[in-house]
Amino acid sequence: MERPCAWKKYTPQQIEELEELCRGYKHFLSENKTERLCVKAGIKMAEEAGYVDLETVIAEGRELKAGDKVYAANHGKDLMLVNLGTAPLEQGFNILGAHVDSPRLDLKQNPAFEAGDMAYLDTHYYGGVKSYHWVASPLALVGVICKKDGTTVDINIGDKADDPVFTISDLLIHLSSEQMSKPAKDAVDAEILDVIVGGRPVKFDEDDKDAPKEPVKQMFLDILKEQYGVEEEEDFLSAEIEVVPAGPARDMGLDRSMILGYGHDDRVCAYPSMLAQINVTNVERTSITLIVDKEEIGSVGATGMTSRFFENTVAEIMTLAGEGSPLALRRALARSRMLSSDVSAGFDPGYAAKFETKNAAFMGRGLCFNKYTGSRGKGGSNDADAEYVALVRDIMDKAGVDFQTCELGRVNAGGGGTIAYIMAKYGMNVIDSGVAVLSMHALWEVANKADIYEAYRGYKAFLERA
């Protein structure tokens, strides 16, 4: 049951639609390298499409009815878009869910130090990373510094053409014999992933008893104060600054068929999900798109999928729509259908031994469906019902969407998980779906434009027809 390459069927008009979609996606990916920025961009997209903040609806005491469109944000890191359908909410929702946190390095709370006449920022990695990926590459600092007076300073240094960039040094090959003999996981110690941010000291009188003990670090702090209004080093205690690859997403391949960028996992699913949501109108079953944080570290915390944000927001909406009983809420959740959208491992001929080709995701063959994920005996996975898989197949076929079914590599080769099992706890039908990528969790991942286009088409069809 080999699936065909999606590119072979496209008309000139479809190629134009594909390129337009991917231009928007490249811009989104390049400009929004943190979960906060993704949510902010998602809110802008929603408001331009006529969505209203749920908090405004609640404050004004308005009722909700079919055709109303609302959004809710959670700590600036989660976003839920809701388009109310004509059917009673108790009959359930059609839900898309993706995450917008990506593997990265986070600054520690007390990060700044000086060594060897250079200023550094100490980091702690976030998510599943290979430490050796992060050395000798241009890096950017993106995030927020929250000050005690209640103001927030936005930090975004390294992505503009005239910005300085940062890096983590690597050991020169001439002195690397011991390093090169280590397993890859030990070649670069995660504790030494320290970002070089300066190499010039402030000027001072050597005899001045108040002269800074770390003059290069002081120069870095002085520039932060002058250019960003960060008054004191202690403001790092209440900061969330992420170290991410510097530079934009770009077309890849001489035929421009792919996109190389940071954060395809999982913004390559989040962006087409949001776009499908705002482009679907006059639905029967209420459509919901959920964009969440913390998936890469287990979906924990107030902004992870295990929080009550989704359930609480649904309860608010059902109450405003006149269906506010606890039983109606439980029925609505259990009767819902969901595509849990996350990336899949694209077949890589260079590492073919890690894949079983009958059930592998191939680049350019369309939207991926993973009936189950997990590892070593499907541990920790959601396993979609056969009846639900049949329903999803029917929706995709009737909409002419190219799709493929796949697993995350050979049996016992490894594995992974998504938010699917968390949503399935409500009793709803959930299946994992998404886009195949190469070099998953590396600084620069690869996605095929045809797969992004088919993902958008598939998500839109699901919201309209499920």
Where are these regions (language model features)?
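N-terminal hydrophobic/helix-forming segments and targeting peptides
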Residues: 1-466
